[in-house]
C-alpha cells in the first residue's frame, strides 16, 4: 500500500480541519509531513466529536502531537480512550524538547507519561530523543526526519549571496540568541535574525537587522542570500534552521545533539556551551576560503543524500507505516 492508501488522522492544537494542499504558504516541516502522508488534520480537543462523527476504527492510524501548553484541557476528557476507539493504531509525535513535560505540574507530568505509554508507537526528532523515549516508555520509537518539500515547491538553492550572517533565533535561552550573536560578531558582517514568537522588548536596539514575520516559502527564498548561519540553540527539537541552511549550502555553526546539525554540518558542530570552539570555527570560515567552500559543499551534498527531502523520506516512512499496519 502507498501512504495515501491509508486513512490517517493527525491531531494537533491547530484550530483547522482538512488536508494540506501545496498552495499552503506555511509549508514548514510538520505541514509538509501531513501533506506527504495524506493525513486529515483535526484539532486535538475535538477528538471526542471526531469519534462521534466517524465511529470506531475509522482511521488506520491516528497521530497526536501533544501541545506544549493546555495540558489541563486534555485532562478533561478520555483522550487516549477515544483515540484508540477511533484509530486502529495510535502514534505520538514529539513536540519540542523531550524534557519539556517536566516543567509541568506533578499531576500533568503523570498524565503525560501515562498517555505516552498507551500509544502503539512514538515518533521523535533526533536519535537522542529516540533513545530517551525508548527508555522512558519501552515502546517502538522511530526518528521522524524533519521534512522539507523545497524541490516540489520549486524553491531554488542559492546561486549568489551577500556578506551577512544570519542567526537562528531571538535573545532568549530557548533559542540561545545571545550566544549566536556573540559568535556572529566574529565575521565582521551585518547580522540578521528572524522574528520569532519569543522576541523580547528592546531586542530591536541591538545591532541586528530583524526580519519581519514571513511565510515558510518566503523565509526559504530570503534565506538564500546569506553567507553563513549561526544557531547555538540549546533547546533541541526539529532542527529546521540547520536544515534550511544546508539546502542552500550555507555553512551553519551549531550544537551536538541536533541531528540536522550533526549530519549536515559535521565540520561546524560543537558541544553545548562551547563558545570557544564556535568562535574558532567562525574565524576559520572567515579566513579560510577553502574551508568555507568545503563546509558549503558538504552541507548541500549531505542534504541531497539525507532523509530530510521527499525522495528519501517517502520510502523510509512508508516502511515504518507498513510495519505498524502489519502488526495490527
Where are these regions (language model features)?
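N-terminal pre-catalytic "stem/leader" segment of glycosyltransferase-like enzymes
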Residues: 1-87, 267, 271, 311, ...
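Conserved catalytic-core segment of nucleotide-activated headgroup transferases in glycan assembly
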Residues: 20-30, 150-204, 210-216
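Membrane-proximal helix-turn-helix segments that form the acceptor-binding/catalytic region
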Residues: 104-121
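Donor nucleotide-sugar binding/catalytic pocket of nucleotide-sugar-dependent glycosyltransferases
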Residues: 120-132, 138-154
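Short alpha-helical segment that forms part of, or immediately flanks, the ligand-binding pocket
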Residues: 220, 242-248, 261
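Acidic donor-binding loop of glycosyltransferase active sites
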Residues: 224-237, 250
Amino acid at each position: 500500500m502507498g501512504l495515501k492508501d491509508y486513512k490517517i488522522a493527525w491531531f494537533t492544537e491547530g484550530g483547522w480541519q482538512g488536508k494540506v494542499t501545496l498552495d499552503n504558504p506555511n509549508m514548514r516541516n510538520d505541514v509538509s509531513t501531513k501533506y506527504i502522508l495524506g493525513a486529515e488534520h483535526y484539532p486535538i480537543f475535538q477528538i471526542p466529536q471526531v469519534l462521534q462523527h466517524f465511529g470506531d476504527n475509522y482511521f488506520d492510524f491516528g497521530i497526536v502531537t501533544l501541545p506544549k501548553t493546555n495540558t489541563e484541557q486534555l485532562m478533561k476528557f478520555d483522550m487516549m480512550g477515544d483515540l484508540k476507539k477511533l484509530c486502529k493504531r495510535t502514534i505520538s509525535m514529539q513536540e519540542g524538547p523531550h524534557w519539556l513535560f517536566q516543567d509541568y505540574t506533578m499531576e500533568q507530568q503523570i498524565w503525560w507519561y501515562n498517555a505516552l505509554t498507551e500509544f502503539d508507537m512514538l515518533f521523535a526528532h533526533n536519535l537522542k530523543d529516540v533513545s530517551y523515549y525508548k527508555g522512558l516508555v519501552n515502546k517502538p520509537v522511530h526518528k521522524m526526519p524533519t521534512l522539507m518539500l523545497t524541490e516540489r515547491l520549486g524553491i531554488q538553492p542559492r546561486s549568489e549571496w551577500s556578506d551577512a550572517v544570519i542567526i537562528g533565533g531571538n535573545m532568549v535561552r530557548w533559542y540561545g540568541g545571545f550566544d549566536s550573536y556573540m559568535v556572529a560578531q566574529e565575521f565582521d558582517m551585518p547580522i540578521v535574525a528572524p522574528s520569532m514568537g519569543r522576541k523580547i522588548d528592546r531586542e530591536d536596539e541591538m545591532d541586528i537587522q530583524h526580519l519581519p514575520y514571513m511565510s515558510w516559502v518566503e523565509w526559504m527564498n530570503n534565506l538564500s542570500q546569506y553567507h553563513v548561519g549561526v544557531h547555538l540553540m540549546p533547546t533541541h527539537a526539529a532542527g529546521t534552521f540547520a536544515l534550511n541552511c544546508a539546502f542552500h549550502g550555507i555553512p551553519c555553526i551549531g550544537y551536538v545533539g541536533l541531528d540536522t546539525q550533526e549530519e549536515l554540518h559535521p565540520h561546524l558542530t560543537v558541544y553545548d556551551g562551547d563558545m570557544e570552539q564556535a568562535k574558532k570555527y567562525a574565524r576559520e570560515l572567515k579566513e579560510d576560503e577553502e574551508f568555507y567552500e568545503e563546509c558549503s559543499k558538504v552541507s548541500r551534498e549531505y542534504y541531497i543524500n539525507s532523509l530530510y527531502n521527499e525522495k528519501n523520506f517517502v520510502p523510509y516512512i512508508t516502511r515504518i507505516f507498513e510495519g505498524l499496519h502489519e502488526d495490527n
